Structure formats: structure tokens, C-alpha cells
Amino acid sequence: MRRQTVDPRIRSKVIATWGNCCWLGMPGCSITATEDDHIIPFSHGGKDTVANLRRACKHCNAMRQDRVLSGYGATMHVVIGPPRADFGMAMQSMLRRDSIVVSFDSLLRDLCPTQSKASDGLRLAAAMAWDGAARTLAKSSEPLDVWLVRTLPRSRRHPDMLSEWIALDYDVHVIETPASETFALDLSHQEYRTAQQWYSLHLTQQAVDARMAARRQRLAALGLRHGDDTARPCW
């Protein structure tokens, strides 16, 4: 990642055009910007231009780590839901023939296809594989169609993944299986604990849609989305 200084004259034009508030708004954002951030990362060929630069706070710029704004390279989707949710059915009508799906459950099955119960070590390995794949694809400059599938929108390194996804304009879909249906299943101890954590978040599609709409309005004001792009994609 390049850390050279942008021409002060270009920076002045960026501030005059787009303002000096952090454009990212990641969890923990300082709001007041102190750094120049490339929408198309410099590593992807992004230029030092008014069109490609926005101001960011140091915290958010470091947290972004060259992840692309969805559509400026890979187009990113996320599907979240409680344990045993039918993730495949939720995505079925939207997947393209070349879509890439990163699913924790699928990775876990691939690691232990002959075991009915995964050990903590295998679950950790699957989680690390998911994180690595998601991180790599989120930085891709190629026009990939990426679907990230998991239950809890958080991890030790990223305690508020949902806010990060919304900041980068991922299309987030919530599977709203009633708690009574999930807890009626023959859940493992780990699944039961995860289900408790999931329902404690009280996530709904309506609430997530409202946050995504507000973010897309902000991106439109920053010249990064057109007015007709601010509505949530139809599922």
C-alpha cells in the first residue's frame, strides 16, 4: 500500500468538492478526516484525482485495508441467518453461474466430511479459511460476484462486521427464521450457543435495509453512487 503524499493542490480540490469528513464511517470512525483515501486503491491502478480521492480518518483508512467499495472491483453480497437456516434457498435465484460463494458451513463440511461433529480445532480452521477467502476477495479488482455466508456478523478481529459491510456498500440479506423454529431443531451445543447469540442481536431485514439506504444516500452525495442506485436491490 502506497503512503506517499498527494499533491496539496489536489487535496484542496478534494476537500472543496467532497468535504473533509471521513467518507468511510467504519466502526470507531473519528469523523474528521486526516488522510487521503483512494476509492479505487492505488494498488489497483487508482489515480491521485479528485474523482478517485476522498478524505478519511486514520482509523477507517487503516481498517479498510484496500477492500473495495462494492462494485469498484468485486460486487459483494452477504447472507446471514441463524444456525440451520436455508442459506442455499435464500441465494438460489440470485446466484450467477460464475458467482463465488464463501460459506463457513461448507468449509467445515469439506474439512471433516466423515465426522458428524466438528472439534473446536476444525471449527477454528474453517473460520480462518473463511476469513482468508473473504479478505482476499474483498480486495479483488476483478468484476467478481461474491457471496459471503455466515451466521454471526462478527469475529474476534472484526467485532462489528455488519457496520463494515454497510460502510463498503455490501448487499446484506438477513434470513429471519423464527426463534421457535430454530430452537425446535436438534441443535448441537455449539449451534445452540450460536443461536442464542444470533437472536440476541435482534437483526431484521427492515433495520438493515434502513441502514443500507442511509449509507447509499451518503455515497450518492459523495459522487460514488447515482441517485437511482440508492435503493436496495430486489431479491
Question: Where do the model's predicted regions map?
Answer:
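Pre-Walker A (Motif I) flank of P-loop NTPase domains
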Residues: 72-77, 142-144
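ATP-dependent NMP and nucleoside kinases share a basic, alpha-helical "lid"
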Residues: 110-112, 150-209
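Short, charged surface segments at domain edges that flank catalytic/cofactor-binding sites
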Residues: 1-24, 43, 47, 70-73
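Conserved nucleotide-sensing/catalytic segment adjacent to the nucleotide-binding pocket
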Residues: 96-166
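Histidine-centered nuclease catalytic patch
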Residues: 26-55, 68, 104-105
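Short metal-binding segments enriched for Cys and/or His
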Residues: 58-70
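Glycine-rich phosphate-binding P-loop
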Residues: 75-96
